[in-house]
């Protein structure tokens, strides 16, 4: 017996080898010659099919039945691989999201209470009645094959004299037809079900994105980018998978099971009822296990949300993590969430194994219980009874095995539906910005308006205000700061404000110019602020800056706001830290909730804004300015000039204004980011502009230029609301609003001076500080001569007036200076640095982002080998395959034993009894169940281990990637690996691998038994296998490329989602929601298009394989007619019918496996990306325990390029910094200042030259040691989600007392101590903290780190003067023994440095003490001080 089986296996191997060789010869010679002869490629491959309609729409019924309409893609994929997107025709119009999304919009717009799943069924089921009819037809037709088989087996059992050969042949063809029609119908039902699933998926993704663009700020806080990505990927994929496979079957499976069991009872009698009872027991058990699977999966998805959110935060803050050397900390946080996720995924796998055991064993248990009962009742098991029952059970196999999976998928679907429903019911932002209307004729006037970040609190406040309407008490609050209550008990300068005869307006000489409306408005404002206005000069002298910085989290609401911005004039909003400036601007934009108390505002018809955190798209410089507007070259050039962008364009090289900008402007300086967003607003030509801190991030020269040429120039005649803490510009404003501790005080500049707000004193204090620093420098140098210093003081108005005309000129006399900060070199026009047309050469030079990697060709065994080795070993996998094969052999032997039982001669007393046969049969079933459990545990171990290893390796690879990797790859693309790809690896690969091994084992054993029964059937088998192999070759070349394109086509969806999420405020203020919505619809349609053709190609081969399988059934039946052993004949035909199902399922799941293994391929490609340069063990400099001990820094001929072929950012840069020196580094935006800091941290490696710290070349220092030894306060403070403690001391290196002491030094102790959980209080990405607070927290980190070298990278640009003074005071007190590098563009920030370094175009043009530079009238530094003097006095 064993020898015969070995011979059969050898024959099968020889057959496959022969087939493979013959097919290769045939395909690569005959077919390719034919291809060349008929020029197939000229027919299919030369044209661009991207915009051509779907060929299915114009195909005839025969092409639709055979899926011939998709052959063009198959042939092009085989003959001219790889495929690209232009080879793929359009999506059918019925599947486009423009036609499907409106079906679900009721859920958003009408506050539908209908559950999402029910709503989808009601909308999409009637559209796809063909799919419903096909599913019903397949269920009904599943009874036909067992009936035909029953008659065929009755024919086989007859003696030869009673047989009529033509009857047998007719029944053979009936088996062929019933098998083919049944399985072909399933293919068509899959196809139409798949179309439904695409409609649902596209519609859901569209409405989720549309809803996201409408989210209020509170809702946005509840849904971070990780949650949004999960909604758009994992949750919508659950819907797609369910509606593709189960949305009709969930109703039909129970009916099908009951009907087939009823048919089994009809065939076998009352014994079938016992089998029915066994089935009833297994179904609830499977359902319970399925529920547990879904429960654990849902829990794991919650941890996956957190993991992806943390990963997104890691990618967004990768620069800061590397500078702080905190990668390990963040990796541990992500790994912690990953472990929790894997814990529940592991529990899910245990339940999954139990489900597989129950469902796979149930058919055998039903058969055992049925035959046992049948035997005990005294009946004989005949061939007709036995194999008809087996066929019924084979038909029962899919509904029985699929029903539990279907139920637990439905439970998972409910969980996803609830997540989506909750999101869709989230509160939305009010429809329009606060100051929109159609007239635009009047001032912006707001009276008695309540603002709040929280809608619920706003309603409570409104109700409370209504209840207390008659009380003489008012509350005025703006976002943060204390709540000031105005009562009748206050007095103002000794005057009782209840005195109606007190003429406040006369006292402060306020003139309303006979404007009754303005008089009423100002009177109301003055009544509110009377009790709060003090002598501001006294306040400035006695101010406690610690109190100014104290805040409570979350920020309190804003109530009873009165605000005015005159039409066509400049309004400046100013105030201290957390005074409410940005909240007021957000309220005007409609970004926070509002309720009108008494009156509505007059409005303008268009409004644009710039925000403190600039939003830049990952597209070209030009597109970021145009922002969807058509190109107007004349205006475009004016905008470039007004925003001082021409020198930056020149520095971009050959790419000019088509140069790509990294996501979030990662490759740009902070000042350039702000100027680009200012240019965007200016180009759009609005009626009203709200500009939030745009002048703080640029140097004084550029700030003055922008103020004069942009704000007072091109924006002249527009309503401009400028939010700034730079009070030197206030005197130029037409209307001033001071926000002080939640109170709005407003009027003209002179009116506010009369009220006691002394701007001049604050400005003079700042100017005097510069003057005192200069005088101190003189004293330190014992230099008392009269020098030109007096010309630089802020009181010398004569020189100021003479120099006002020189603000925009080059600094003559300094031959080191390359060019002015604001103008182009002579001979270069602005037109020459703007690309005239989109020529391919310029575009290629302008590219920053790299095209997403896409492997080509068949990944073959290599990718599977890598995947398996990550979870176990190749030998372990081979052992698993053997167990799969063994279990199927045992099952097949049980069927063989059953035919022996049915065929034995019961009249012969020497033959074994029925009990003997029954016991052996039970032993076979027991062995099958045991090996079943073992095989599933083994494959689960491999896939689970691989998933764990892949994520860990991916995370380590990303964290070690150089900064250029993140500049060249959008966040969405990277998160796609951590989201969709890892999710597929975690969940779907287990099912796919298991099903492929199971079906493969079934096919091998089935083919083996058929050849064993009828050896001559091997001859036609060779032909059929050869034809099948040819189909497979054509299929594989195309489907692999389609799957890769499909994976890549998802990245733009996620990238755009991430981009829009981060830029919602800007997008909404520009009214660009529709444009981005259309972009997302295009991206979704492209992804669905590739998905559509991918599935169509699978159906093309599926229908052909089904036909070949039906021929196998026909041949097996024909050979059985002439077989002398009826039992073996019955076994052969039954096995052939099983091949039909198994081959169909194998093709389906193998295609699914190939698709999912692409996720492994994509993750693997990121694991192998280049890493940051590691120091070799031999080259590593073994530093002492304390390093650096002195803090000496030396740059030696350093040259740095961000990319190999780019312009050098630093050139021939040499500079030596002694220990404990304070170095001030200044230069225009983009001059290379920040690159110096980046090079110190080895964020960018030197192209040439070297950097030494304490005499050690930092390129030979371990990266972690280097970065952890240098302190930094960055220009864009980044606060990670987590506690205050985590943001200050992530490695628990310091005690609570040390942390509190550091907080006290930066004057944040009071703020943190008032938080509910003190150091453990959560700050989600810095929400509720001002820029100043964030900078102080970063300063606190530097104090705790106690490094010998500290870098301050433009750390005070975006904060007010008081906070800047606090930071400088803290630096002086806590970093006395440190080497300090201060990068800045404000002179007063670095004037007290020991030396000043001036950088221009990447070169060091001046480096000396401040005094020496000041004494040199030709130096750049002395001219900068003069310029600073001129600008401020001109404004005054």
Swiss-Prot record:
One of its GO terms (molecular function) is ATPase-coupled transmembrane transporter activity. It is found in: Membrane. It is a multi-pass membrane protein. GO terms for cellular component: membrane. It comes from the Eukaryota. The keyword RNA-binding does not apply. Residues 543-766, 1193-1426 form the ABC transporter domain. Keywords: ATP-binding, Membrane, Nucleotide-binding, Repeat, Transmembrane, Transmembrane helix, Transport. The chain crosses the membrane at residues 8-28, 129-149, 165-185, 238-258, 261-281, 349-369, 373-393, 873-893, 919-939, 985-1005, 1017-1039, 1101-1121, 1127-1147. InterPro entries: AAA+_ATPase, ABC1_TM_dom, ABC1_TM_sf, ABC_transporter-like_ATP-bd, ABC_transporter_C-like, ABCC_6TM_D1, ABCC_6TM_D2, P-loop_NTPase. Residues 128-412, 865-1155 form the ABC transmembrane type-1 domain. GO terms for biological process: sorocarp development; transmembrane transport. Its main location: membrane. ATP binds at residues 575-582, 1227-1234. Belongs to the ABC transporter superfamily. ABCC family. Conjugate transporter (TC 3.A.1.208) subfamily. This is ABC transporter C family member 15. It comes from Dictyostelium discoideum. The lineage of its organism: Eukaryota, Amoebozoa, Evosea, Eumycetozoa, Dictyostelia. The gene is abcC15.
């Amino acid at each position: 017996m064993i020898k015969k089986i070995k011979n059969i296996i050898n024959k099968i191997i020889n057959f496959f080898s022969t087939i493979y060789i013959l097919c290769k010869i045939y395909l690569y010679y005959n077919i390719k010659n034919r291809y060349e002869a008929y020029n197939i490629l000229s027919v299919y491959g030369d044209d661009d099919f991207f915009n051509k309609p779907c060929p299915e729409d114009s195909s005839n019924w025969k092409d639709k039945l055979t899926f011939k309409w998709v052959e063009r893609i198959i042939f092009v994929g085989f003959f001219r691989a790889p495929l690209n997107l232009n080879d793929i025709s359009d999506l059918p119009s019925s599947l486009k999201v423009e036609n499907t999304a409106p079906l679900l919009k009721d859920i958003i717009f009408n506050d539908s209470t209908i559950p999402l799943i029910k709503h989808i069924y009601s909308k999409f089921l009637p559209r796809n009645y063909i799919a419903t009819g096909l599913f019903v037809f397949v269920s009904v037709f599943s009874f036909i094959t067992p009936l035909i088989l029953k008659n065929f087996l009755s024919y086989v059992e007859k003696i030869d004299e009673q047989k009529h050969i033509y009857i047998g042949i007719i029944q053979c063809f009936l088996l062929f037809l019933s098998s083919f029609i049944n399985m072909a119908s399933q293919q068509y039902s899959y196809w139409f079900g798949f179309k439904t699933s695409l409609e649902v998926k596209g519609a859901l993704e569209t409405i989720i994105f549309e809803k996201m663009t409408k989210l209020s700020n509170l809702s946005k806080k509840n849904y971070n980018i990780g949650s949004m990505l999960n909604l758009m990927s994992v949750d919508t994929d659950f819907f797609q998978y369910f509606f593709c496979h189960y949305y009709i079957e969930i109703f039909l499976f129970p009916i099908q099971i009951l009907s087939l069991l009823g048919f089994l009872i009809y065939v076998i009698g009352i014994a079938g009822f016992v089998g029915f009872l066994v089935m009833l027991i297994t179904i609830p058990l499977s359902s319970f296990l399925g529920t547990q699977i879904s429960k654990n999966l849902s829990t794991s998805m919650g941890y996956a949300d957190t993991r992806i959110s943390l990963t997104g935060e890691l990618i967004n803050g990768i620069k800061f993590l590397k500078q702080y050397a905190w990668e390990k900390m963040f990796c541990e946080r992500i790994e912690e969430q990953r472990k929790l996720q894997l814990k529940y995924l592991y529990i899910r796998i245990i339940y999954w194994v139990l489900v597989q055991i129950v469902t796979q064993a149930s058919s055998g248990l039903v058969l055992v219980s049925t035959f046992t009962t049948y035997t005990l009742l005294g009946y004989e098991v005949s061939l007709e009874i036995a194999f008809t029952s087996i066929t019924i059970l084979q038909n029962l196999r899919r509904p029985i095995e699929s029903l539990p999976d279907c139920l637990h998928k439905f439970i998972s679907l409910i969980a996803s539906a609830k997540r989506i429903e909750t999101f869709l019911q989230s509160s939305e932002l009010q429809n329009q910005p606060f100051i929109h209307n159609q007239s635009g004729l009047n001032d912006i006037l707001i009276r008695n308006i309540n603002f709040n970040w929280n809608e619920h609190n706003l309603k409570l406040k409104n109700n409370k205000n209504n209840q207390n309407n008659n009380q003489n008490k008012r509350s005025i609050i703006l976002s943060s700061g204390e709540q000031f209550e105005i009562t009748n008990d206050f007095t103002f300068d000794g005057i009782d404000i209840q005195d109606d005869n007190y003429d406040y307006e006369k006292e402060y000489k306020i003139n309303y110019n006979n404007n009754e409306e303005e008089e009423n408005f100002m009177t109301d404002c003055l009544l509110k602020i009377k009790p709060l206005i003090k002598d501001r000069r006294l306040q400035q002298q006695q101010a406690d800056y610690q109190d100014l910085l104290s805040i409570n989290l979350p920020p309190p609401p804003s109530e009873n706001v009165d605000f005015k911005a005159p039409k066509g004039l400049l309004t400046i909003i100013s105030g201290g830290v957390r005074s409410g400036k940005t909240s007021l601007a957000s309220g005007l934009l409609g970004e926070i909730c509002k309720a009108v108390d008494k009156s509505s505002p007059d409005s303008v018809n268009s409004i644009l804004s710039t925000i403190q955190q600039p939003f830049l798209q990952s597209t070209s410089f030009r597109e970021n300015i145009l922002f969807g507007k058509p190109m107007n070259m004349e205006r475009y050039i004016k905008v470039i000039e007004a925003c001082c962008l021409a020198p930056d364009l020149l520095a971009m090289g050959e790419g000019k204004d088509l140069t790509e900008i990294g996501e979030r402007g990662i490759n740009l300086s902070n000042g350039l980011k702000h100027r680009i967003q200012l240019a965007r607003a200016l180009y759009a030509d609005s009626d009203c502009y709200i500009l939030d801190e745009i002048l703080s991030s640029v140097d004084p020269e550029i700030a003055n230029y922008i103020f004069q040429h942009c704000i007072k120039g091109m924006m002249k005649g527009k309503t401009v609301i400028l939010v700034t803490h730079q009070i030197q510009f206030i005197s130029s404003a037409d209307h001033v609003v001071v926000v002080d501790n939640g109170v709005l005080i407003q009027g003209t500049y002179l009116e506010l001076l009369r009220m006691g707000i002394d701007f001049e004193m604050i400005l003079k204090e700042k100017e005097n500080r510069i003057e005192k620093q200069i005088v101190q420098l003189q004293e330190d140098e014992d230099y008392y001569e009269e020098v030109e210093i007096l010309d630089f003081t802020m009181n010398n108005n004569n020189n100021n007036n003479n120099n006002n005309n020189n603000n925009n000129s080059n600094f003559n006399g300094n031959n080191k200076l390359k060019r002015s900060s604001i103008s182009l070199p002579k001979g270069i026009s602005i037109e020459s640095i703007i690309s005239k047309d989109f020529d391919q050469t310029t575009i290629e030079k302008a590219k920053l982002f790299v095209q997403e990697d896409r492997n080509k060709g068949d990944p073959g065994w290599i990718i599977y080998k890598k995947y398996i080795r990550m979870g176990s070993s190749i030998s372990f996998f081979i052992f698993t395959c053997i167990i799969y094969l063994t279990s199927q052999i045992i099952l097949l032997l049980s069927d063989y034993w059953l035919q022996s039982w049915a065929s034995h001669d019961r009249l012969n007393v020497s033959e074994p009894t029925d009990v003997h046969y029954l016991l052996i049969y039970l032993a076979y079933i027991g062995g099958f169940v045991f090996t079943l459990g073992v095989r599933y545990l083994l494959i689960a171990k491999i896939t689970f281990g691989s998933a764990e290893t892949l994520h860990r390796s991916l995370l380590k690879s990303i964290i070690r990637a150089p900064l250029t990797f993140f500049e060249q790859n959008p966040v969405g693309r990277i998160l796609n690996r951590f989201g969709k790809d890892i999710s597929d690896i975690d969940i779907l690969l287990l099912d796919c691998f298991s099903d492929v091994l199971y079906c493969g084992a079934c096919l091998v054993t089935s083919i083996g038994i058929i050849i064993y029964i009828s050896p001559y059937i091997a001859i036609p088998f060779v032909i059929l296998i050869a034809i099948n192999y040819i189909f497979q070759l054509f299929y594989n070349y195309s489907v692999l490329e389609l799957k890769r394109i499909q994976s890549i086509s998802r990245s733009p969806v996620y990238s755009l989602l991430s981009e829009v999420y981060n830029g919602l405020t800007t997008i909404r203020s520009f009214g660009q929601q529709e444009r981005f919505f259309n972009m997302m619809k295009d991206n979704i349609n492209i992804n669905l298009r590739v998905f559509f053709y991918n599935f169509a190609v699978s159906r093309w081969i599926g229908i052909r394989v089904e036909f070949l399988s039906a021929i196998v059934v026909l041949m097996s039946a024909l050979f059985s007619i002439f077989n002398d052993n009826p039992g073996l004949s019955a076994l052969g035909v039954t096995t052939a019918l099983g091949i039909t199902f198994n081959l169909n399922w194998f093709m389906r799941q193998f295609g699914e496996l190939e698709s999912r293994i692409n996720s492994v391929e994509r993750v693997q490609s990121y694991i192998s990306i280049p890493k940051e340069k590691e120091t070799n063990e031999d080259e590593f400099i073994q530093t002492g325990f304390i390093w650096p001990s002195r803090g000496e820094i030396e740059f030696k001929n350093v040259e740095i390029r961000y990319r190999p072929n780019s312009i050098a950012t630093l050139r021939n840069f040499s500079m030596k910094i002694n220990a404990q020196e304070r170095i001030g580094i200044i230069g225009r935006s983009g001059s290379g200042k920040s690159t110096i800091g980046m090079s110190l941290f080895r964020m960018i490696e030197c192209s040439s030259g070297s950097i030494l710290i304490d005499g050690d070349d930092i390129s030979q220092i371990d990266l972690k040691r280097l970065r952890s030894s240098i302190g930094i306060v960055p220009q864009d403070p980044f606060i990670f989600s987590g506690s205050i403690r985590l943001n200050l001391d992530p490695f628990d290196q310091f005690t609570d007392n040390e942390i509190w002491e550091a907080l006290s030094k930066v004057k944040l102790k009071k703020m943190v101590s008032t938080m509910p959980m003190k150091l453990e209080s959560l700050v989600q990405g810095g929400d509720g903290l001002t820029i100043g607070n964030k900078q102080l927290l970063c300063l606190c980190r530097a104090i705790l780190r106690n490094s010998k070298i500290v870098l301050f990278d433009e750390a005070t640009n975006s904060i007010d003067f008081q906070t800047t003074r606090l930071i400088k005071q803290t630096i002086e007190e806590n970093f006395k023994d440190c080497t300090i590098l201060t990068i800045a563009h404000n002179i007063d920030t670095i004037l007290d440095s020991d030396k000043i370094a001036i950088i221009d175009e990447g070169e060091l043009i001046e480096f000396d003490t401040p005094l020496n530079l000041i004494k040199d009238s030709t130096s750049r530094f002395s001219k900068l001080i003069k310029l600073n003097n001129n600008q401020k006095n001109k404004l005054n």
